[in-house]
UniProtKB/Swiss-Prot annotation:
Subcellular location per the Swiss-Prot or TrEMBL entry: Cytoplasm
Species of the source: Bacteroides thetaiotaomicron (strain ATCC 29148 / DSM 2079 / JCM 5827 / CCUG 10774 / NCTC 10582 / VPI-5482 / E50)
Claim: Hydrolase is one of the keywords in the record: no
GO cellular component: cytoplasm
Function of the protein: Involved in the anomeric conversion of L-rhamnose.
UniProt name for this protein: L-rhamnose mutarotase
Amino acid sequence: MKREAFKMYLKPGYEAEYEKRHAAIWPELKALLSKNGVSDYSIYWDKETNILFAFQKTEGEGGSQDLGNTEIVQKWWDYMADIMEVNPDNSPVSIPLPEVFHMD
């Protein structure tokens, strides 16, 4: 199982809305992530920088960042685009973070 971390950017003033939308994550999106080996997925917010830090475990080759070709993920991106920094296709600007330490 791989561990992956990445950062994204939340627009200022949208912290509560971001949490609200994720508290009601679509069941079909959650099922897609699970079906594709994504587990132990957490997102943290740095209130000083509005950086979102995401961590997930993945089985196989892909992770949540590799599901952008699916209709449900594209709809989620569109739904979140007004409150996050996004690319032209509405995918969140996402920067992978290398692991520099791990302890079991």
